[in-house]
């Protein structure tokens, strides 16, 4: 199982065309072993992006069942909640809820991505889709 952490980072970014700076808050989803590892991976990512003056504002554990990246059609991150009824022979049906983090260019394409993932293997219902504040995923 993935240990996913949401890491909020604050830094100053130069404004285009002026000498001023603007405050930027970004949220990174980090696959890490611990809070310390999540912070270390975030610091390494910020250094790769040549951002040296920043502050890790908060770190919290996230409970996503799956994180689906989309290299060809990405851009924004969405939270999706999917409910399914799983039933084995002779047993009562069990409701399973999955929280997904999905990268897509538009909210309308999220349902396509979910149907590609689940397909016809389980009957499911898409409960909710919302825009996430995640800026980037660090593996």
Question: Where on the chain are the PLM-derived regions?
Answer:
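Short amphipathic alpha-helical linker/capping segments at the junctions of internal repeats
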Residues: 27, 52-65, 122-137
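A cross-family "folded-core" feature that marks the main globular domain of proteins
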Residues: 4, 8, 20, 41, ...
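Intrinsic, low-complexity N-terminal interaction/targeting segments
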Residues: 53-90
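A short, charged, amphipathic alpha-helix used as a generic interaction element across diverse proteins
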Residues: 34-50, 106-121
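Mixed-charge, glycine-accented linear interaction segment located at domain edges/termini
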Residues: 92-94, 98-138
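Short, structured motif recognition centered on aromatic/hydrophobic residues
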Residues: 3-9, 26-29, 38, 42, ...
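A cross-kingdom feature marking solvent-exposed beta-strand/loop segments within repeated
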Residues: 13-30, 48, 91-100, 118
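Beta-strand elements of well-folded, non-transmembrane domains
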Residues: 11-15, 31-34, 82-88, 102-106
